[in-house]
Swiss-Prot record:
Similarity comment: family membership: Belongs to the UPF0284 family.
Name this polypeptide is given: UPF0284 protein M164_0030
Lineage: Archaea, Thermoproteota, Thermoprotei, Sulfolobales, Sulfolobaceae
InterPro entries xrefs: Nict_dMeBzImd_PRibTrfase, Nict_dMeBzImd_PRibTrfase_arc, Nict_dMeBzImd_PRibTrfase_sf
CDD domains the UniProt entry points to: DMB-PRT_CobT
S-S bonds: none
Signal peptide start and end residues: none
Length: 347
């Protein structure tokens, strides 16, 4: 049910944990054809806030429906909420820099939304804010927890992740995943190559040029936390791990990436080679959604969406605690059915 890579072990996950969802936006998501993490490019800026609202409330306030792809495939926040319903951990939303802020309580890192990486993603002032404040958050969480799970929501985040990995010296071109089964590799490559021109030599200035607020918020929270960390995400979390490694070469021994089989088995990406380069362990949930009653859920098995909002890590946490595949899929179907029945989802 869970596959282990590079020395990852599931036994460390059998303790109380807090779920941290770091949200933000990047104007890269407005580039047509780059992401399907929203019904239109403009709606991608609402996706992180709506994801956060749905995980906490079971409904969205920022938009009148949960985020969907242009073809109606639901957000992975649905999988996250279903998995966490069996555990009920503390859930904290962290705004690293979202264009639309959620209408729920959240912690603000005093960052800013990411701009177009082909010009300049973030100001140095905001980069420092995000890193310093997220480190402090991690330190405070250490007072209560020995384990945290960090998820992310930022449309076009795989593109900024690829730019970040390349800027830090990793062989990452064409190796990141996509929410679409048709990974727009040529467009991503073109955007990233343009972003990487005339890079400054200082690593922090490089991150300000091509990264995004979420990667910095995830990295900072991890750097401040004293216990074990499950980075719940796909190829984006290899970029977060790379940033962590820039600051503290010893930190990755306490960190594991928890993702989905759809990420590690993605033929159009190579998440495992990225994790190996960075030096981070990986766990993958083998959750099978082909038995779902709903086509929108079964679409995940065809390569749609794949990961996000901590879906893979949350499934791992549920499976480690004895929740069966069938039970988890029934819960996902139940939540999806409620959305369809209440007209909170247009399919």
């Amino acid at each position: 049910m869970i596959k282990e890579y590079y020395g990852a072990e599931t036994f460390i996950l059998n303790k109380d944990f807090a779920y941290i969802l770091v949200i933000g936006t990047t104007d890269v998501s407005l580039i047509p054809g780059l992401t399907i993490a929203g019904a239109t490019p403009e709606l991608t800026h609402f996706t992180p806030a709506a994801d956060a609202e749905y995980v906490l409330l079971g409904k969205c306030k920022s938009i009148n429906t949960i985020p969907v792809s242009p073809t109606g495939i639901p957000t992975p926040a649905l999988l996250t909420r279903a998995s966490l319903s069996f555990i009920n951990p503390l859930k904290i939303v962290v705004n690293a820099g979202s264009r639309i802020v959620p209408k729920i309580p959240y912690i603000d890192l005093q960052g800013e939304p990411g701009k177009d990486i082909r010009k300049q993603a973030l100001s140095m002032e905001k980069v420092n804010n995000i890193i310093e404040n997220s480190i402090k958050l991690g330190e405070e969480l250490s007072n209560e927890y020995e384990l945290i799970m960090i998820g992310e929501s930022i449309p076009a985040g795989t593109t900024t992740a690829m730019a970040t990995l390349l800027a830090l010296g990793y062989d990452a071109m064409d190796k990141v995943s996509s929410a679409s089964p048709d990974n727009p590799k040529e467009l991503k490559r073109k955007v990233v190559e343009e972003a990487l021109r005339n890079l400054p030599t200082d690593p922090l200035q490089r991150l300000a040029k091509v990264s995004d607020p979420v990667l910095l918020g995830v990295a900072g929270t991890s750097l401040g936390f004293k216990g074990k960390i499950l980075l719940a995400g796909g190829t984006q979390m290899t970029a977060a791990a790379a940033i962590i490694n820039e600051f503290d070469k010893n930190k990755l021994k306490d960190i594991t990436i928890g993702t989905t089989k759809w990420i590690v088995e993605d033929k159009f990406a190579d998440m495992l080679s990225l994790a190996k380069q960075v030096g981070v362990k990986v766990l993958a949930s083998m959750l099978d959604l082909s038995i779902s009653a709903y086509e929108g859920i079964r679409a995940y098995e065809k390569g749609y969406v794949k990961e996000g909002v901590g879906a893979g890590g949350s499934a791992i946490m549920a499976l480690v605690r004895g929740v069966s595949n069938n039970t988890l899929v029934r819960k996902i179907d139940e939540l999806y059915g409620e959305l369809v029945g209440s007209n909170n989802l247009h399919i």
